Amino acid sequence: MKKTILLLSVLLAMIAWYPLLVITGWIQKFTVTVQCPLAAYFVLTLAFSLISLYLMCLKEKTVNAVTTILSGLLVPFSVANLFTWVWENRTFWFLLLALVWVVFSALLMYIYGKHAFFQGAMMGGSAVVLFLVVLLCLLLVFFSIGRITIVQTLPSPEGTYYAQVIDDNQGALGGNTLVEVYDTRKKIDLFFLSIQKDPQRVYWGRWGEFQNMKLEWESEQVLVINGRAYEVD
């Protein structure tokens, strides 16, 4: 029984840490960046799948209130996991890998969930949300809605800041050219990810301007964009 609860807890931690961290970042104004995100997500997906298969193949399965709660939480967090990974990376492979998490989570809840009503309510609600999330993710991946591309990065003379020119492509809605400045002092590097305070947006222009944009640092705290100076806080 302890092994089952422990492994379900490990799976819940694996599936919940990224959505919770990213959503907290949206609220608290910091950015989470995973190094080699596709490789990292593939390894996490493989580990999640192997642990799930082990739990599914156990001959004597422990089913109680704790396993019901833990397995039930896997399903909504798997949907949140899908949305945040695809939203932050916007490629088909992330959508495909995220669906693996959803499938295994649903199977584990079916096996280790104790109450039929709880199972039905959780599965029904999650299915509706999953449909909407997958639809949104397909639009993001295949129709370039909200696709953001960094076209230029320029560090300040002393390396305290770096400016990025961004092509914010909104598809049929047009888009924008953005210039954002990051403070390298407000960054935490961890094992395979980094956490950094959101940048200061110093310029917001028309889509396509980045193609002819001239960017240079006049001093450590003054950035010149197309001949106009912008002071960095």
What are the roles of these predicted feature ranges?
Residues F142-A163:
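Alpha-helical transmembrane signal-anchor/signal-peptide segments
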Residues E158, V165-D233:
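Extracytosolic and intramembrane catalytic regions of membrane-associated proteins
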